[in-house]
């Protein structure tokens, strides 16, 4: 699911609890009768590091997030009450009273990464989700919802520990992302800034139905679901306009249009009336056209573009949220393994493999064409898909440079300032400058030389809170396969697509 790849639901990388799917399947009565047969106590510990104490970083090499991002050596950055209040040469820096002084010894200080497409409900292990819809029904009770919140909390903290300071959710079960966002914002525990949709909106038989999307049977139902999400506190609306690789029954038809234009248009109209942007899962040219006509603000994933679609991207439809032009979110991470790894490893059929090739090619082609036409392109991982962990945003940045063909500076600029602007957060985060939130990532090596430097940050700060324990619980088997892909030359992708008759 998600990108059509299937979804590893509930395999949290950090949770001390057993996998929810494993727990429920081995204890089928555990969550019956509102969880009364088995009482599972979930403790959401308070692990917030205070932002009250000022911090002074000295001897930093600043990469500010701007497009050309010239390194600024021997610099200092002062953080007070969660905000960058001063920047200048380390030689003249003065620590505020009581400040913690951190000598970076020349390390590279940059804005925290922003991940534009995240499902927090899984770990990225390539396992079957099984009957996820039935599992959701068992979890829809007070104890089950507490378990889901605990898992999403762990995933959010994995994102943060890996250097991601802002996450835009793409739909998770049981509105749990809204609760996690509120807990983070209230200071109950550390986590990234979370732009949360609650659940998505789909149609009968559509992507995400019964898992992380509500089913709308008509335009009126879609509009009502959007209004309900707004009342619950959603920051963005997620639509599932097309199917994906695993929905297709024949080679050549991934991304079949599922949501009628009138349903998508009703959802967009209701969202825009209350100021909410709309993001949409789309994996076909037909779907992109329908979504943009309906008023969708960001196309997630993408597909090959026609001249008519390029005009819609430029805002010719006039139905997007006021003040915003439509954009595309590039998500290479879930597509690439299905092209470059053996089907035995991805658990895909021959039909799914070939349709995966089509979608992967379309995502890359869409990003290239959009950039050439001046359309904004953001970056996200589609975390929770097979082989897409909660700690690998750095890989998406590297894939963007490698396969779309942009420079390292532009890739990092996209993952910071551009993503912030696309979220409407450009005045708050995305660059290192006075007055903005202290969302900071530090690496030993220069990512402008090698984006793999982003893999192991030495310091992460979000809204002025320094993460004291950068613990990323890695999945060695997944990492090994992805490292092998990273080592392949860019030409390997084109060669594989050509072999399958796609390129």
Segments (PLM) and residue ranges:
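Histidine/acidic residue-rich metal-binding segments in metalloenzymes
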Residues: 179, 220-327, 342-347, 357-377
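Histidine/acidic-residue-rich catalytic or RNA/ligand-binding cores of hydrolases
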Residues: 125-127, 177, 247-250, 288-294, ...
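Active-site metal-binding motif and surrounding structural segment of the metallo-beta-lactamase
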Residues: 90-110, 137-139
